Amino acid sequence: MTHCCSPCCQPTCCRTTCCRTTCWKPTTVTTCSSTPCCQPACCVSSCCQPCCRPTCCQNTCCRTTCCQPTCVTSCCQPSCCSTPCCQPTCCGSSCCGQTSCGSSCGQSSSCAPVYCRRTCYYPTTVCLPGCLNQSCGSNCCQPCCRPACCETTCCRTTCFQPTCVSSCCQPSCC
């Protein structure tokens, strides 16, 4: 089979095809693997496929971010996915995989005024010094792959763009 499957945000869409899919585009492969390509675990050759939830790298040989997949040579543990990354508003398309907004992304006007951190696994409300977004008052929002990260902030966020709201939201608002 050489046909290609339609993309989706979960790798399960390639279950019955000779395709390895990402959230952005499908890729046709020449032969069907003996292991179905519908789970992140199918990347046994140090090559991973991305997903929209960074938890997909928990037990695979992949390290994924919201932005792009990165192949590694050994299966990673949850701790290897804890590299802080910047808000999408901080460095444009280089939103993930940076050591910190302040140092890796620089402190130019294009990066100010948000300097937030999050891990690939669990969004936190930990902000670097000077992390203030005037439209959020004294609170600072940070991105995650699930809007639930707005539970304790005055922001409603998505994987791509944080949006401030006028009052602190409850889990139900997400």
From Swiss-Prot:
Residues 8-172 are annotated as: 17 X 5 AA repeats of C-C-[RQVSGE]-[SPTQ]-[TASP]. It comes from the Eukaryota. GO terms for cellular component: cytosol; keratin filament. Sequence repeats lie at residues 8-12, 13-17, 18-22, 37-41, 42-46, 51-55, 61-65, 66-70, 75-79, 80-84, 85-89, 90-94, 95-99, 144-148, 149-153, 154-158, 168-172. Keywords: Keratin, Repeat. The keyword Repeat applies. One of its GO terms (molecular function) is identical protein binding. Belongs to the KRTAP type 9 family. Interacts with hair keratins. In the hair cortex, hair keratin intermediate filaments are embedded in an interfilamentous matrix, consisting of hair keratin-associated proteins (KRTAP), which are essential for the formation of a rigid and resistant hair shaft through their extensive disulfide bond cross-linking with abundant cysteine residues of hair keratins. The matrix proteins include the high-sulfur and high-glycine-tyrosine keratins. This is Keratin-associated protein 9-2.
